[in-house]
Amino acid sequence: MDISDKIANGGRVSEAEALALFDAPLFELGRMADARRRSLDPSGEAGYIVNRMVNYSNVCKAMCAFCAYHAKAGKISPYTLSDDEILRLCGDAVERGGVQLMLQGGLHPDFRLEWAEGLLRRIKAAYPELWLHVFSPSEIVWFARGAGIAIADCVRRLKDAGADSVPG
């Protein structure tokens, strides 16, 4: 059975076959992915959403080696969006048909749980139709530790403030 048939029928590919996919032509990969999708949902329907990604800051205490956007001394200038700037971007997203806001910004030393709750409440009050897909798990841990509360309590407070889901 060739790799296209395996993928379309939900079969497992070998490590060598998976590596070979890196060199496959883009349209061939798309064709294989579509064949797999059709095997799972023969209706032929597909969907999408209009999502706005807002990185509210690139100031981060973690300084992860893999991160491509955090401020690096002398290389990338730090920035932090104001709450009003974030709200303006939300409005722009809604005007363009946006239905979801993804909000992330790292472990900012000045931002705590109370800030996040206030921001989410302002966004939900102004744009109740936006699905708020907000804050990475590491940001949530940062907020919980800063507030001296359990992670579950932090998640509950963010949800109560308007968070709909968490990325990652």
Predicted regions, residues:
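Flexible, acidic/Gly-rich N-terminal and inter-domain linker regions that tether
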Residues: 1-61
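Short amphipathic alpha-helical segments, especially helix-boundary/capping motifs
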Residues: 6-12, 63-67, 94-99, 130-132
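Conserved, mostly hydrophobic/aromatic
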Residues: 10, 33, 64, 103, ...
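Surface-exposed loop/turn and secondary-structure junction residues enriched for glycine/proline
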Residues: 16, 24, 29, 57-59, ...
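Short, charged low-complexity intrinsically disordered segments located at boundaries
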Residues: 31-35, 59-68, 149-154
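Active-site cofactor/substrate anionic-group-binding motifs, chiefly glycine-
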Residues: 40-95, 166
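Conserved Radical SAM active-site core
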Residues: 73-168
